[in-house]
C-alpha cells in the first residue's frame, strides 16, 4: 500500500470512529443525577377554549435528563403504580408498554373529557391507549370545574419513540412539536455526559 493510500485509509477510519462515538453517545444509558431539565421541557401541549392537555413521555431514554427532584418524582410515580402498570401490560400481552403522564386542565366550568380520545401517531400508525391508570379522583369522573386538573398514567402497546418524531391528538387538537425538542435533548445529553465524567452525581444529600 502506498503512503498516499495509507493516509486516506487512516482518515476514513478516524471519521468512522468519530461517527460511531457520536451515535454511541445517544445509545448509551443516561446516568441520573446530572440533568437540569424540567418536566415542562419534556411536555407536549395542546388546547382549546375548554381544555389544556399536557403529555409527558415517561421513557428512560430521556427522564434521566431531568433535574434530580423532577426525575425522582416521576420515577416514584411509576414505581408506586408498578403493579397496576404490569397488570395492564400483561392483559394486553405487552412486555414493555409505552408510558406517559397525561394531565387535563379545565379552562371553564363543567368541562367533560374522554380519556380514550387521546391518541398517539407513530410512523402513520395510530395507537389508542391500551390502559389508563387514574392518579386523581377527578379523572374518574371525567368532568372538571374551572382551573381543575385531572391526571393519569397512559399505557400504549409500544414504547413512545422519543428519538424519533410522533404526534399526539385529542379530537381536532394535535401536537407534533416533539421534533423541535430534539436539539434541547441532544444538548442536555452532551452536558450530562460531560458532567458525569467530571462531577459527583447530585443525590440531594
Region annotations inferred by a language model:
Residues 19-205:
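Conserved functional micro-motifs across diverse proteins
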Residues 8-12:
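Hydrophobic helical h-region of N-terminal Sec-dependent signal peptides
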Residues 1-7:
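Bacterial N-terminal signal peptides that target proteins for export
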